[in-house]
């Protein structure tokens, strides 16, 4: 089974990806992971990507596509794969489909973990971490016993820069701009499925398993 995983930052994609990978015995392929693997392995594709990244430039679509194509051509992807973080654009989606058609293959499901923007905003901006031991908290779902103080070591808890309101808003704006056209694309391809990501982890996965079991 060949699956594309879609969803906003903070929707729990990483957690569900691990569960899907284990349940269906397919590799979870994160774009970030394969970029890092190519760069650390000093592959030709990795060195090209590093050249752009070192200059603070976005890696071009063509190179990103080549890196993904190389990864899904490996033996462990013969029975399928789960792509997380790719495609990000319709151009990438079309290139992936063209590559798969050439191999007489296709995407079986574009799975959207759907969480309303307001819910994601609250999830992310409410996160806190201990400034010393790194313990994780949330002001609403998992607060410290004493406000602002780590339960484990007594150090102050802080909000990471990535979780500030401005940063989260920008990340969600970027996601909306990039992903809405992808959702339309995969809906038109009749492979889009959606699950309610506001539920607890086990219930979300139960819904995912039911959706994928029907394919």
Swiss-Prot record:
Residues holding AMP: 31, 36, 57-59, 85-88, 92, 160, 171
Pathways per UniProt: Purine metabolism; AMP biosynthesis via salvage pathway; AMP from ADP: step 1/1
CDD domains the record matches: ADK (cd01428)
GO MF terms, alphabetically ordered: adenylate kinase activity; ATP binding; zinc ion binding
Binding locations of ATP: 10-15, 127, 136-137, 199
Pfam family of the protein (one): ADK
Gene Ontology annotations of biological process type: AMP salvage
Domain notes: Consists of three domains, a large central CORE domain and two small peripheral domains, NMPbind and LID, which undergo movements during catalysis. The LID domain closes over the site of phosphoryl transfer upon ATP binding. Assembling and dissambling the active center during each catalytic cycle provides an effective means to prevent ATP hydrolysis. Some bacteria have evolved a zinc-coordinating structure that stabilizes the LID domain.
This protein's name: Adenylate kinase
Species this protein is from: Clostridium acetobutylicum (strain ATCC 824 / DSM 792 / JCM 1419 / IAM 19013 / LMG 5710 / NBRC 13948 / NRRL B-527 / VKM B-1787 / 2291 / W)
């Amino acid at each position: 089974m060949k699956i594309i995983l879609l969803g906003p930052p903070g929707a729990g994609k990483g957690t569900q990806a691990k569960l899907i990978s284990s349940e269906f015995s397919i590799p979870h392929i994160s774009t970030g992971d394969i970029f890092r693997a190519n760069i650390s392995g000093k592959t030709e594709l990795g060195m090209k990507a590093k050249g752009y990244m070192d200059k603070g430039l976005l890696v071009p679509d063509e190179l990103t596509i080549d890196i993904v194509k190389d990864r899904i051509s490996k033996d462990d992807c013969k029975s399928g794969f789960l792509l997380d973080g790719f495609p990000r654009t319709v151009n990438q989606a079309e290139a992936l489909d063209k590559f798969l058609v050439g191999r007489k293959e296709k995407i079986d499901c574009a799975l959207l973990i759907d969480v309303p923007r307001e819910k994601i905003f609250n999830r992310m901006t409410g996160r806190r971490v201990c400034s010393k031991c790194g313990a994780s908290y949330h002001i609403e779902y998992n607060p410290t016993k004493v406000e602002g103080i780590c339960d484990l070591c007594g150090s102050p808890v802080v909000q990471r820069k990535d979780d500030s309101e401005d940063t989260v808003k920008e990340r969600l704006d970027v996601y909306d701009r990039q992903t809405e056209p992808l959702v339309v694309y995969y809906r038109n391809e009749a492979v889009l499925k959606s699950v309610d990501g506001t539920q607890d982890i086990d219930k979300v996965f139960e819904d995912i398993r039911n959706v994928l079991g029907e394919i």
